[in-house]
Amino acid sequence: MTKWAASLIRISNHEVETLQKRLAEITERRMAAEMRVTLLDAEAEAEAKNAEGDPSAGWYMIGYREGSKRRRADMLVQIEQCQQEEAGARDALSEAFENLKKYEHVAEQAKILAAKKMNAFEAAQMDELSIRRAAVGGR
């Protein structure tokens, strides 16, 4: 394999690995946000159950529900942003992987071409050797 092909493949591998790490981080952030929404919903449900038994809790529950709705909406926006970022990262990773495969294919073709040239050169040398032997007298 030629130096330039090895360098391209190494750089492409690095790019693919970097994009895989980025995608993993984005997915982790999205999952954490989804977990926070789940916890927020569970917390709101627990507060509602606690407020059922206390008549004075009705006043603070109004504010609590509004705050909970806002936090939930913020988390849902964050999840949506993560999903969009994740889709972009997946596309970039797919493109980088395609480029890597192209470079590997070009390197393989260059290797095959070099082997064909070497075989043709060896065949020409053997032909020349047999012609010389025939000219000398068949030794």
UniProtKB/Swiss-Prot annotation:
Please report the record's description of how this protein sits within the membrane: Peripheral membrane protein
Q: What is its main location?
A: membrane
- Family, similarity comment: Belongs to the FliJ family.
Describe the function of this protein: Flagellar protein that affects chemotactic events.
User: Where does the record place it?
Assistant: Cell membrane
- Disulfide pattern: none
- GO biological process terms on file: bacterial-type flagellum organization; chemotaxis; protein transport
Name of the protein in its database record: Flagellar FliJ protein
Q: Which gene encodes it?
A: fliJ
**GO CC terms in record:** plasma membrane
Q: What keywords tag this UniProt record?
A: Bacterial flagellum biogenesis, Bacterial flagellum protein export, Cell membrane, Chemotaxis, Membrane, Protein transport, Transport
